Amino acid sequence: MCSSLCALLLVILAVHNVHAKSDPELHMTTPQIIERWGYPAMIYSVTTDDGYILELHRIPHGKTNVTWPNGKQPVVFMQHGLLCASTDWTMNLPEQSAAFIFADAGFDVWLGNMRGNTYSMKHKNLKASHSDFWEWSWDEMATYDLPAMIDKVLEVTGQESLYYMGHSQGTLTMFSHLSKDDGIFAKKIKKFFALAPVGSVKDIKGFLSFFAHYFSLEFDGWFDVFGAGEFLPNNWAMKLAAKDICGGLKIESDLCDNVCFLIAGPESDQWNSTRVPVYASHDPAGTATQNIVHWIQMVRHGGVPAYDWGSKENKKKYGQANPPEYDFTAIKGTQIYLYWSDADWLADKTDITNYLLTRLNPAIIAQNNYFTDYNHFDFVFGLRAPNDIYLPIVDICTKDYNGK
């Protein structure tokens, strides 16, 4: 889950503010932001087995030449979280953003976009204006989107494997796919870097916990009546909130920050406050209401179940009345590096220690990195993240790729 959810509360407060300053990046796409900072940007598309057309963004190299022993660059793939997009990895200044840091280190950087977000709104046969376009959750992202994007990247680059860095839902989909892997997919992932890793979300805190426990029945009822649809798309209202509140007077920008902290965890001392309007203008990037229902089901269930269609439909789909659980104990063959924090209210410490760490085989956990003061968004937007997380990952991948 990502900073996009801040806009859920902010949009109702948006009013015109003559003092607000508009950053040009508020209205740019990911490739435009990349090019604004002097980096090359490329766009690719891939079609999933169930017909969704996903857009991938690529930074093929940085501003300096880096020579690799075998003549080929290492490939890193970055996957956003819930309600987010490829933009998340580029929204800070270049020396603070993961995508640019890896590009300048000589990596071929690829940024994924899951179905239903700003950049992945197409299907071979379905239209986004129709309900059937939105009948999916992260189940389908893990089953279809993730392997389709990974295979496309490897096809274009001519590599056999890549380094994967995911945040929040971007870790959940990888864990889930690996748990059902027959051994072939795992060989394509050299190393899996899990930022704010998500398994169970039973013990989440803050606004989302309150929503899941006290308003989920109302949300379910709305979903039952109106069916599948789009949830929190990136539109003019969100950009208005980003500009006029997050980019307004100090009292208003502080309000913007505090709403975000209500969702992500305690107030952060490592945000670039001048970039908050940019964050809020690109997130939320949209998802399906059915995906939100699936997350609510996870809060209620306390584990990582497949989507619950109801006992009758579950029997048709799964052969049993209750949805099956993803078995994280079955994950093997990929080295995993965990990055989590006591201050993260979404990838909660209790969920990680009581669920994730008790199920992942210790043999595949290469590193278990614990921070005391990172909230959920700090792993992507925090000013200490480059030194604490990104550059150490660059070093790990560089040594691995060079065979050291």
UniProtKB/Swiss-Prot annotation:
Its main location: secreted. Glycans are attached at residues 65, 272. The active site is at residues 168, 344, 376. Induction: Up-regulated in the intestine by fasting. Down-regulated in response to a high-glucose diet. The keyword Transmembrane does not apply. Optimum pH is acidic. It is found in: Secreted; Lysosome lumen. Residues 1-20 form the signal peptide. The keyword Acyltransferase does not apply. Keywords: Glycoprotein, Hydrolase, Lipid degradation, Lipid metabolism, Lysosome, Secreted, Signal. One of its GO terms (cellular component) is extracellular region. It comes from the Eukaryota. Belongs to the AB hydrolase superfamily. Lipase family. This is Lipase lipl-3. It comes from Caenorhabditis elegans. The gene is lipl-3.
